[in-house]
Amino acid sequence: MYKRQRYFRSNLIKVSGDYLQNKNPDATILGYDQWQWLEQELNKDFDFLIIFSSIQILAEDHEYEKWSNFPLERDKLLNLIDNYKDNTLLFSGDRHRAGIYKKNNLFEITASSMNKPGSSFVETDKYLIGKTYPQENFVFMEVFEKTIYVGIKDMYGNTLNSISLNY
């Protein structure tokens, strides 16, 4: 684990309630030291790697805070993952809704909130598998010898969406 993502992050650009992309090459989410640390960690041997982010990495189409607000940083992260790790799973939150996203062979599970549901509007995204769930939810993960089963459950423990990953 390392320092919080927001500690080094450049300012977001906001217009009329929407966050816009910051394409400034000096804009950062992690800062230089955290990027160096992350690349060193990705060079290590893992059977399976899980990366946690407070904000969504794959999602692009909503108006809220996400890695794609900093497209150069997002591309840098996705390229690092692509260059170093085949078996990677992303977890994120801070959306007050849950969803499973997939870009190429990379999956992201977003889950929140356990106690404060989001609005009921229908959200779409080109990387979204199925739909998002604005009700209270949580993520579950079961790890077996060569398979990880991960998904989203509602507050009653019912599975809303899930995926199975072999590694």
Predicted regions and their residues:
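Metal-dependent phosphoester/phosphodiester hydrolase catalytic core
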Residues: K3-Y167
